[in-house]
């Protein structure tokens, strides 16, 4: 070993160490050349969109503390992948170029979408990207309930049909993690060849919301809500049947009819809308329509604390509205495209239970009506159909991941699911979030 002025030449040590980590070391190839930890199991998290990345966060976090596992990220081709790379960077990840990811081999591939996955090498674990598998596949997709061709076939449940799970006659995932036994039954109807690889693990969002509800007042205080203030959460999914298409009818009513004192209103828009039209466009449309009286959340916001804190939910057929059935907040449906909804889903049951927002009656009287006629047991029955493994997602999901990796699990139970307290939307120092310009 070379000495420099009687000391170890650390540069030479680094050169020798780098020489032992040449191109091709391990499965992952050249990306590991300069790694400090070598011999790790290589995990690729495939982020198709901001929503998919948010959904996967609770899953890959189960691996984050294990020095035997190296988690990497890539952004897949997708119509809504604008913002996906920024999401990866926001959690401290580095984006592996898609072309490089397709050349390498991984010990585990994690994804909540389906596009492009046939290009990747490694056992694939697929997950849903929302709750309840509410939506049907697009009309005219040519995929029938049995996976046959033609344009007149029965529409499959979005995410559960062969168009999402089968490529070139082969079931792609090594495992398909589902939230509820009902979804497994849907796979049996729509894509029976994938039934053997399904596994019911529960729903991570469900567990985190459920764990946060007893501390609801802490979340309300963190957001800046004062005692007695009512929070109306307006949430929209994406697409032509969403609440967003009626924004010019809904938001002016919130701005004009709700008293400024005693109410706060927040708008949560599915990140796919911002990905398609730009965050600036969404913010501009919403703030102009609401005349500054509604706080607009950006696509990277964690919506779960808002849902926990909400006193009322005005929504549509999106996942957030369905999760609202857990909270005890009365729900009004402003839009619901019944023809595009899986009739066996909990979302369809919600549409038959929750009152519909009417343009012909005062908004405050409709909120009062929703509160008076709210029956907690009815909505609890809907919420129970989101997850058939309540409180057990982290344990069951971790067991599945380590089984695919071929590793023993860490010798401790996963940390209990915790929903972080949010930064204030409505600071109590005299500033106001009602202009729609704060934290967007």
Language model segments and positions:
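A nucleotide-sugar donor-handling region in carbohydrate enzymes
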Residues: 2-5, 132, 137-140, 148-151, ...
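Extended catalytic core of nucleotide-activated donor transferases of GT-like folds
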Residues: 80-165
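Catalytic binding pocket for nucleotide-activated donors in carbohydrate/polymer assembly enzymes
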Residues: 319-385
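Donor nucleotide-activated moiety binding/catalytic core segment of transferases
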Residues: 96-100, 279-314, 318-319
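Conserved catalytic-core segment of nucleotide-activated headgroup transferases in glycan assembly
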Residues: 52-65, 198, 204-284, 388-399, ...
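N-terminal pre-catalytic "stem/leader" segment of glycosyltransferase-like enzymes
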Residues: 1-97, 416-417, 428-440
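C-terminal amphipathic helix plus adjacent low-complexity
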Residues: 2-5, 361-440
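A donor-sugar binding/catalytic signature common to diverse glycosyltransferases
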Residues: 115, 122-126, 298-343
